[in-house]
């Protein structure tokens, strides 16, 4: 019999299945609407101070959590409605299949020898300057994006959904969207975007570790994944991308990391990232291997998290 906690687990599974089958909605995506709202609010809240960014994030993430809590409260005595609500929220929040299709296009173009088109395509996945990347660098950019996005577009939201339900799903996606919008180190957002970046780091901590663990267990070389994770992840500038990318590099037997350029012209910023893994530079066919590993990790995370979502909720004592 379907009850409230099982409804959450069923909803997560349904939402995951919808994302795998249909990807993101082609039109009227709620996340795009949220981004428009956030950009408009920024016109009022922006100031070159961390405190202004804290207010901006609190208002928008708080609104997402509140909407999710109100919707879940309304469905609390109707398990089927709760399952459908959770499924809709999960489908809205997950982005794994859309990103997988973008990465597949990069791999296909590289395998066909169409480097200029591959550079243009990989720019849809990463924020770095891709105009002069060579074949191995394009493959590396695609694999790093596949690894990181497996965590923050699939596993991390499922973790929050399993633990907190719809409020966790919507709050996570709000925080993640704000990080993408303002959580970077440009002159405008270095201070204002601090709160968005730190909150996104915090919310992604458990999901990134689960992603790295599953990549290690489900990859072709668990020992190499463990070595890369333990040895290389800590030197990465991101506390969450480091473990995930290192584990993927070890599992795939390739080397990630290296020189990365963000922006162009006078505002260009160069990061010399440490190497992750101990194999050769990735080849075009490694993009497809990374995508297959990401698919296994996504499904594995659902298998791990569904029982957590289905755990009985003890009634509060009065």
Residue ranges of predicted features:
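Short amphipathic, positively biased membrane-proximal segments
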Residues: 1-318
């Amino acid at each position: 019999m379907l009850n409230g906690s099982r409804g959450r687990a069923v909803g997560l599974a349904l939402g995951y299945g919808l994302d795998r089958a249909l990807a993101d909605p082609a039109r009227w995506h709620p996340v795009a609407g949220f981004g428009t709202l956030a950009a408009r609010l920024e016109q009022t809240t922006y100031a070159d101070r961390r405190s202004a960014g804290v207010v901006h994030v609190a208002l928008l993430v708080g609104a997402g959590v509140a909407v999710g809590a109100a919707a879940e409260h309304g469905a609390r005595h109707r398990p089927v409605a709760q399952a459908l609500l959770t499924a809709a929220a999960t489908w809205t929040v997950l982005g794994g299949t859309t990103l997988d299709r973008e990465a597949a296009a990069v791999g296909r173009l590289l395998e066909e020898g169409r480097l200029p088109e591959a550079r243009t395509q990989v720019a849809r996945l990463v924020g770095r300057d891709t105009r002069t990347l060579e074949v191995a660098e394009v493959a590396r950019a695609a694999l790093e994006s596949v690894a990181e996005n497996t965590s923050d577009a699939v596993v991390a939201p499922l973790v929050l959904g399993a633990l907190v339900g719809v409020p966790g799903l919507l709050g996570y996606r709000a925080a993640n969207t704000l990080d993408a919008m303002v959580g970077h180190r440009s002159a405008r957002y270095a201070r204002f975007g601090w709160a968005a970046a730190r909150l996104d780091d915090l919310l992604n901590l458990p999901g990134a570790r689960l992603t790295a663990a599953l990549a290690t267990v489900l990859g072709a070389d668990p020992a190499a994944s463990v070595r890369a994770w333990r040895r290389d992840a800590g030197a990465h500038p991101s506390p969450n991308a480091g473990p995930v990318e290192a584990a993927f590099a070890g599992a795939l037997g390739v080397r990630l990391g290296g020189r990365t350029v963000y922006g162009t012209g006078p505002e260009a910023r160069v990061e010399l990232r440490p190497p992750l893994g101990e194999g050769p530079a990735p080849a075009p066919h490694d993009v497809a291997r990374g995508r297959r590993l990401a698919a296994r990790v996504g499904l594995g995370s659902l298998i791990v998290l569904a029982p957590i979502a289905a755990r009985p909720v003890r009634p509060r004592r009065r």
